[in-house]
Design a protein with these regions (language model features):
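Two-component/phosphorelay signaling modules centered on CheY-like receiver
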Residues: 15-32
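Acidic, metal-coordinating helix/loop segments flanking the phosphotransfer/catalytic sites
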Residues: 33-51, 69
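Receiver (REC) domain active-site loop signature in two-component systems and cognate sites
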Residues: 58
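Short, conserved "switch-loop" micro-motifs in signal-transduction and mechanochemical regulators
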Residues: 87-88
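C-terminal output helix
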Residues: 91, 109-118
Length: 126
């Protein structure tokens, strides 16, 4: 029996973090990656995603800019987004949520926390 696995886009400028997320989620999800905001925007035009894991601080187009673009786009506005950031003051969390993030995941994070959050969001949106 073959089932379509949900598709996730992992966006972070740190390759080891992208790899960790993709390995952690790879059994249950199809994972694509982008190392910057511009590549993320291109990937979002090429494929349909069930969830986006998005770093805030990246060179070039920031994660916040990608998130704002997604929320203004009719095709992307309902895709759940988990913002990942080492910045974790109450103001940083509020800023991410106000920009349209569904959840905020502080770096470094626990693997079990990541898995639970992603499964809950993908299950809710699917």
């Amino acid at each position: 029996m073959t089932m379509n696995r949900p598709r996730i886009l992992v966006v972070d400028d740190e390759p080891p973090l992208r790899e960790l997320v993709m390995v952690t989620l790879g059994d249950a999800f199809v994972c694509d990656e982008a190392g910057d905001g511009d590549t993320a925007l291109a990937r979002l035009e090429e494929a349909r995603y069930d969830l986006v894991m998005l770093d805030v601080m990246m060179p070039g187009t920031s994660g916040t800019d990608v998130l704002r673009h997604m929320r203004e786009d009719d095709e992307l506005r309902d895709v759940p987004v988990v913002v990942m950031s080492a910045w974790q003051s109450p103001q940083d969390v509020a800023s991410a949520l106000e920009a349209g993030a569904d959840r905020f995941l502080a770096k470094p994070f626990r693997i079990d926390e990541l898995g639970s959050m992603v499964r809950a969001l993908v299950g809710r949106s699917g």
